[in-house]
Amino acid sequence: MENGAVYSPTTEAAPGTGRGARSGLAAYFVLGRLPWHRRILKGLQLLLSLLAFICEEVVSECGLCGGLYFFEFVSCSAFLLSLLLLIVYCTPVHDRVDTGKVKSSDFYITLGTGCVFLLASIIFVSTHSGTSAEIAAIVFGFLASSMFLLDFVVMLCEKLRESPLRKPENNAKVEALTEPLNA
């Protein structure tokens, strides 16, 4: 037997690799797991929370800094959480995790982030000094919190639409399963 025949199956290029329309890093990103309206909402959450964080970082002086610091923490956390959720939805990580757990995590993270971001924006409104950077951060904060809460409402509507489909079909099957086998 010749060496070429022994080693040829292991040295051939794997099918589907090489230069194509989706090679390299682009092959790892799949945007189709979310409907188009949810993709837009997730992108707006990411963008607006980043803009709120950047505008807040530009603020150089503050009178009552507690609201500013809380807003800073919340806007940065919202940005990182929305980035994490987008990474999970758009990469092969989504295939390795249970889809129900991803949806449930997204549901509760979006609700919590939206509520806390709204609270941080309200607190920042009551403690800001009136500079243009603070006002821009507040506007982006309210817009970002509204995108988070709108995404939560969309997920809630989808969840309520799915729930009647999952009701038990027949209780007679359950009764038949509990009967003894030797009867």
From Swiss-Prot:
Any Pfam family hit: MARVEL
Cellular-component GO terms for this entry: early endosome membrane; plasma membrane; recycling endosome membrane
Location within or outside the cell: Cell membrane; Early endosome membrane; Recycling endosome membrane
Domain of life: Eukaryota
Membrane-spanning ranges: 46-66, 68-88, 107-127, 135-155
Annotated positions of the N-acetylmethionine modification: 1
Positions bearing Phosphoserine: 8
Keywords: Acetylation, Cell membrane, Endosome, Membrane, Phosphoprotein, Transmembrane, Transmembrane helix, Transport
GO biological process, one term: regulation of protein stability
Its membrane topology: Multi-pass membrane protein
Family: Belongs to the chemokine-like factor family.
UniProt subunit comment: Interacts with PD-L1/CD274 (via transmembrane domain); the interaction is direct. Interacts with CMTM4. Interacts with CD58, ARG1, ENO1 and TMPO.
PANTHER family: CKLF-LIKE MARVEL TRANSMEMBRANE DOMAIN-CONTAINING PROTEIN 6, MARVEL-CONTAINING POTENTIAL LIPID RAFT-ASSOCIATED PROTEIN
Purpose of the protein: Master regulator of recycling and plasma membrane expression of PD-L1/CD274, an immune inhibitory ligand critical for immune tolerance to self and antitumor immunity. Associates with both constitutive and IFNG-induced PD-L1/CD274 at recycling endosomes, where it protects PD-L1/CD274 from being targeted for lysosomal degradation, likely by preventing its ubiquitination. May stabilize PD-L1/CD274 expression on antigen presenting cells and potentiates inhibitory signaling by PDCD1/CD279, its receptor on T-cells, ultimately triggering T-cell anergy.
Protein name, UniProt field: CKLF-like MARVEL transmembrane domain-containing protein 6
Species this chain originates from: Mus musculus
Gene from which this protein is expressed: Cmtm6
